[in-house]
């Protein structure tokens, strides 16, 4: 989860140090044995095998991607305090691919003045569709309501009912596999970094990792740069067949990502596991405490 796509840095250089001969002042080790002459030393060097210096290992395909992700996360943590957007998403949960969800989202990122948290993470979601959950609202403010979600039911019946829910409960995970506590752009990149680190550990030689970059992509009319990672073969520790992320070239935030599982057979299309698209993104909208007040759930 760009200003420019980074290229892999130069690989480490290995230097082979040889030993030379001194040709003057060399004493015979035994009586009657002459010191080697310059000519004999040169001949000895010429007879040595011509062993080339070992080639440095090639960098892992994900090395520059990780570096890039760290730099982007640092940039967002320094410059983005809050944002609003609309999310269009669907996920495969318990084997079934959801219908598209359309969600308006208000997010206040966590900020620090070391070591104190000056602004806790806060999230408000309002579901626009599909109809069975239209009008649902979900509120989370770290440190309030015992760190539980406040949820207005929405939908066709008893839409006004508000309950509090554990964000790690199974009922929440049946709706979304992305924790609401990790929904901010910085947290999306943090989750991406952890996944990349796991990929490197599972494929340390990088022979099962293909990285593609598209610098001229467009998402909803906005110029983007896209990164796609593919693992052709299923392997322990790898979580996906392919995953893509698009970064808005002007805003430097991820505006789309999708993940695919491995196909069951080579002639099948890989099954979609999840996709998220962010539109109408406004950064630093100066969201205040009233935006994340519980009273928002009781309104129309």
For the regions a protein language model found, what residue spans apply to each?
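Bacterial N-terminal signal peptides that target proteins for export
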Residues: 1-10
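Intrinsic-disorder-associated interaction segments
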Residues: 6, 36, 40, 55-65, ...
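Bacterial N-terminal signal peptides
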Residues: 9-20
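Compositionally biased, proline/threonine/alanine/serine-rich low-complexity intrinsically disordered stretches
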Residues: 23-59
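Exposed alpha-helical structural elements
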Residues: 42, 64, 68-71, 75, ...
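N-terminal mature ectodomain segment of secretory-pathway/periplasmic proteins
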Residues: 60-159
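Gly/Pro-enriched, hydrophobic low-complexity segments
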Residues: 92-94, 128-132, 139-141, 145-300
